[in-house]
Amino acid sequence: FTGHLAADLFWSLRNPSQVRWGDFVNAAVEAGIAALPIVGLVSFLIGVILSFQAAIGMMQFGATSFVGPLAALGIVREMGPLITAILLAGRSSAAFAAEIGTMTVNSEVDALVTGGLSPIRFLVVPRVLAGILVMPILTLYADIVSILASMFTMLAYGIPFINFYNGMVAAVSLEDILSGLVKATLFGVVVSAVGCLRGMQTGTGAAAVGISATRAVVSSIVMIVLVDGVFAVISYKTGSVSYTHLTLPTKA
């Protein structure tokens, strides 16, 4: 499956006019625009919780001014991409598995093969391309919402917006943002591809589609955590993760 998918994705770059862009748009709308409310809500809560818990610990050392920069780094590097990917695993991966699983049960996938069409090229590629598009956008949206939530939370500890902003700008680099977006793109591939794979592996029977959807969610989350762990190790080995540039924000 992985080899066929990689080959068909490369084929789609060479033959964009033959991609089913209608399915791509439908998948992008369902996975992206329809997910904005839940991603925004969860990201806001994550921003509040993360900064609040960090502030409790930092208050013991009189370093509450570090909460903003550290929260922003945690959101951009880890929490933004990870939470967004898990939410999409619960929504889109299950939806893709259910859609393709229903087609498998109804022998529509077999009909494509009989007609000389590639199910991966016909069904999977548009959904994977949609995942590649929407995941970085949703992650950037989640980062912004979470950071704004952290800003409001820090007001309760007497840290003005300008202090939070100055600390965040000093702490978060373009490399941090790009690292999170690259990770989000990989998550987009994983979530959409796993959902489609589980859909194509659907068996027979009334419960088959539900089982495939459940397996898609579980497999997607496991793969997300695995990819995140590998990405963290690579970042550490290459030296792209460092906190030595952090400085205590000065009061306005």
Regions found by a protein language model. Give the residues of each.
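Hydrophobic alpha-helical transmembrane segments that constitute the membrane-spanning cores
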Residues: 45-49, 85, 125-154, 194, ...
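Start (N-cap) of specific transmembrane helices in multi-pass transporter permeases
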Residues: 27-30, 107, 118-139, 216
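Short cytoplasmic-facing helical segments at TM-TM junctions of multi-pass membrane proteins
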Residues: 99-125, 209
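Loop-to-helix entry region at the N-terminal start of transmembrane alpha-helices
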Residues: 30, 34, 38, 63-96, ...
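Membrane-interfacial helix-loop-helix connectors in multipass membrane proteins
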Residues: 52-77, 144-185, 189, 194-215, ...
